[in-house]
Amino acid sequence: RHDKWLCMMYPRLKLLQKLLADDGVIFISIDDTEYANLKLTCDEIFGSNCFVSNISWQRTYSTRNDSKGIVNEVEHLLVYSKQPGWNPQKLPRTAEMDSKYKNPDNDVLPWTSSDAFAADAATHQGMVYAIQHPFTGKLIYPYNGAHWRYQQDTMLEYMNGWTKYELRLLDDAKQRAEICGVAETNVRSGVKALMLADPIEIASANAKKVLERGQWPRFYFTQNGKGGIRRKTYIDSVEGKPPTNYWSYSDVGHTDEAAKTLKAIFAGRATFDTPKPPRLIERILQIAGKENTLILDSFAGSGTTAHAVLNMNKADGGHRKFILVEMMDYADSITAERVKRVIQGYGAGKNAVEGTGGNFSFYDLGEPLLVGDCLNEAVA
């Protein structure tokens, strides 16, 4: 019954919202059965303006041939923040991402080719002007609606890396106005162009020497110097990959992987029906918090959250802490026992897994002190 489930969840979500730090975020795992009800409930408790995303986790890696109807391969992760405007951390760079960065000019760092321009010329009219091509002498303007990526003094510094440039006023108000999308009478006046200080023969000879030498300036020219202008984006200037709302099993694990992990910890015994893979929680930790974050899992289950926290701390030397809450009778025999074995290490021989280190405390909630407004005689 949906109403019974909501009556169980509502007060818990209200409490969790209060417990969140001001920069905190909550991830709630849910299947299709209660997704719609949970979304409306969370909109009420957290506020629809604090909704961050509905992430689809591909929890299975194979489809049964005898499956009926539309096969359900994903589970949802509803994400809400304590305050509006929360932004996730970037994901670590991958080898595939790094492979796009090359070093054809023997520069200090690998780089990839990027646009030399940026949008919104109308509000950056001082950055709309001509740059004279050092190889051909032709004038290069930003395309319509765009401006040069950096301020003019920075562009001058980069272009001086090819040959000597100077600022010169041109009669090009009509062309600049067209680029900015304004009337010629309204375009900013007095904006100078970056022009070659020497005759084209000397300038192109200087530029050719730089081209052959290597380590070209930040703004370079394609087609062996004869083509258009482009910008280098160095590998160390890109932080990482923004997370998306689809997480494949190859990136964060699947239910079969989670079950195998538990069996390895408990010497082949299947101790839990619906575990989550540690890699799934590790992905959440990567985008949700920093290395000293406090993580609360109020439905701890098999203890995957603690496992993921311990893995992350071992990997990056972080100081994350966890609080697990579990009401079922396996809290001691499975949840806490798993945490202990992960800390100490488990398995034997070639299947041995080194312990993560760390420690934790286990507390058993006793009888309440009060029953209604009266003292509980069982603990008096």
Name each model feature, range by range.
Residues R1-L294:
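Class I S-adenosyl-L-methionine
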Residues H2, L6, T33-N37, T274-K350:
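Conserved S-adenosyl-L-methionine
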Residues D23-I26, F51-S53, T293-L296, G318-I323, ...:
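Residue-level recognition of the N-termini of beta-strands and the immediately preceding loop/turn
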Residues R59-N65, D329, D364-L370:
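Short, conserved secondary-structure transition motifs
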Residues Y61-D66, R320-M327, C374:
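Short beta-alpha connecting loops at secondary-structure transitions
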Residues K82, Y249, M327, L365-E367:
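Residues immediately flanking
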Residues A95-E96, D172-I179, G301-S302, T356-L365:
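A glycine-rich phosphate-binding loop feature that marks nucleotide/adenosyl-phosphate handling sites
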Residues V339-A380:
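SAM-dependent methyltransferase catalytic region
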